[in-house]
Amino acid sequence: METTIKLNVPEDLMSLCTIYNIQPQKVLECFAKNVSFPRYYTDVNGKNRWATLFFLQLLDGKEDETETDTGLEEHYLQHFNDTLAIQLEEHNDNGVKARAAGRNVIRDWQKAVIAGRAKYILDGL
């Protein structure tokens, strides 16, 4: 998925990007590629967990500002955890099948969230 984002690049980041000849969007793309619940929870010794940890800390700090159906969140997080546990136990493949199964749960959760938001909008008409 591709999206256009307008961003005010802070001076410190822009300075480093200039020094190292890296475009700011490349930094953000690299960061975005590393945000992954399935990888975060299946590769506990992995070195690319920091982006997801940052995302989790952001959620924790912005808890009052997000509109999350906590019942739906609890249901899908439990399903996600159960799915990962089963897949990790059944397959000795360094979490490959667990990550794929985890992504499927995340996709189902996303569909449920979108359906709930659409229902909310349509019910208001």
Residue locations for each model-derived region?
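Short amphipathic alpha-helical heptad-repeat segments
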Residues: 73-89
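Short, basic amphipathic alpha-helical segments that act as recognition/interaction helices
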Residues: 20-49
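Short Lys/Arg-rich basic patches
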Residues: 1-9, 18, 47-48, 53-74, ...
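Charged, low-complexity interaction regions
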Residues: 88-100
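Amphipathic alpha-helical interaction segments
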Residues: 39, 58, 62-63, 84, ...
